[in-house]
Amino acid sequence: MFDIGFGELMLLFVIGLVVLGPERLPVAVRTVTGWIRAIRSMASTVQNELTQELKLQELQDSLKKVEEASKNNLSPELKASMEELREAAESMKKYFKGINSAALDPTEPHTIHNPLVTDPEALHDGVTPAEGDRQAEAPLMAPSVKASAPADSVANPGEPIAAAAIGQPAAASVDAASTSPSAKVSAPADSAANLATQAATPAAPAPAPEEPGRAATATGPASSTSPLNNDR
C-alpha cells in the first residue's frame, strides 16, 4: 500500500528503538498497525461504494439506450394505441377542469347580496346568506291586543255601586294576603266582616226633640224645693 521495502522497514525499526526504547516500542508498533488497518478498511469501503455507483450509472445508461431503441422500433399498432391513450387522458383532464371552473365561477356573480357560500351547514340547509338577510329584514307582525275590559264595562253599565264597594275590600284583602305574611291575613277579613254586619243592621232612631214647656215644668219643682232643703 505505501510501497515500503524491507530495508526501509528495518531503518524505521531501528529509529523507533533508539527514540522510544525497548519498553515503548511494542506499544507504538501496535498502535501504528491498528491505524494502518483502519485506513485500509476505510479505503476498501470507499472503493466498493465507488464501484457500485459506477455500475449503477452504467446500467442506467444502458437502459436509456434500450428504451430509445425500443421507441424507434415500435410497431404502428402500438404507436396508435399509445396515442389513443394520451388523447383519452387529455380529454378527461379537460372535463375535470371544466367541472372545477363551473363550480368556482357560477353564472351569477358573487356580490354583497349573493355572496359565496362556503359553510357546509348552509349548503346542506339550502339557505344562502342573501335569503337569510331578506328574511331578517321582513317586517314583524304586531300581536293583536284584546280589549276585553272596556267591552265588559260597556256591556254592563248599570251595575250597582255597592257591589264595587264590597268588591274593593275583598280585593284589598286578597292583595294583602298575597303580599303580607300569614300572621296579618286575619285583620282585613275581620274588617270586611264588620263592614258587612254594619251595612246589614238598621240604624237606631234618633231621639225626639222635647217641648220647651215640659222642660220648664220639670225644672221648676226642683228649684222650689232647693231652699227648703237648704233650711232643713
Swiss-Prot record:
One of its GO terms (biological process) is protein transport by the Tat complex. The keyword Cell membrane applies. GO terms for cellular component: TAT protein transport complex. NCBIfam families: tatB. It comes from the Bacteria. One of its GO terms (molecular function) is protein transmembrane transporter activity. It is found in: Cell inner membrane. Part of the twin-arginine translocation (Tat) system that transports large folded proteins containing a characteristic twin-arginine motif in their signal peptide across membranes. Together with TatC, TatB is part of a receptor directly interacting with Tat signal peptides. TatB may form an oligomeric binding site that transiently accommodates folded Tat precursor proteins before their translocation. Belongs to the TatB family. Keywords: Cell inner membrane, Cell membrane, Membrane, Protein transport, Translocation, Transmembrane, Transmembrane helix, Transport. It is a single-pass membrane protein. It comes from Sodalis glossinidius (strain morsitans). The Tat system comprises two distinct complexes: a TatABC complex, containing multiple copies of TatA, TatB and TatC subunits, and a separate TatA complex, containing only TatA subunits. Substrates initially bind to the TatABC complex, which probably triggers association of the separate TatA complex to form the active translocon. This is Sec-independent protein translocase protein TatB. Residues 189-203, 214-232 have a biased composition (Low complexity). The chain crosses the membrane at residues 1-21. InterPro entries: TatB.
